[in-house]
Amino acid sequence: MALVGAGRRPARCVMVLGTSSGAGKSWLCTALCRWYARQGLRVAPFKAQNMSNNARVVAGGEIGSAQYFQALAAGVEPTVQMNPLLLKPEADTRSQVVLLGRVNAELTALPWRTRCAQVWPLLAQTLDALRREYDVIVIEGAGSPAEINLQSSDVVNLRVARHADAACLLVSDIDRGG
């Protein structure tokens, strides 16, 4: 039985980071997915962790709406691997954790920093698996990578960029101060 992507080099990665939430990362990632697909490349979106109550049901569970539409723009079937960690806010200090499409009550109960340490290996493995299957991965960051208080438990911005050796683009919204 042959492994998918066996003998291929891992996909190139481009990562879109932003100066803030709402800067336009999702829109740019969607456009990049479409552009790469039109170049004849097999492209997939990836966002390690998304915090949103806007989710779409796909085979295997649910993912953030942005990654769902990015996959459609890329011309591929959306999968739970494209958004392996979805946090659905339930209250000011509590979020339901959806891991690879399914609610994970054990992770939901853990403190945020503990949860991040436990999920990072799975997030990295999921990205690596996508890199074996596609030519290009368009990675979306979250919020701003400059939030110093979050860097020690980062599983979505610079840690992902380093892991993937991704070329990074920085998006800014001038209406929000650049």
Label each residue range with its predicted role.
Residues A2-G178:
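Flexible phosphate-sensing "switch/lid" loops adjacent to ATP/NTP-binding sites
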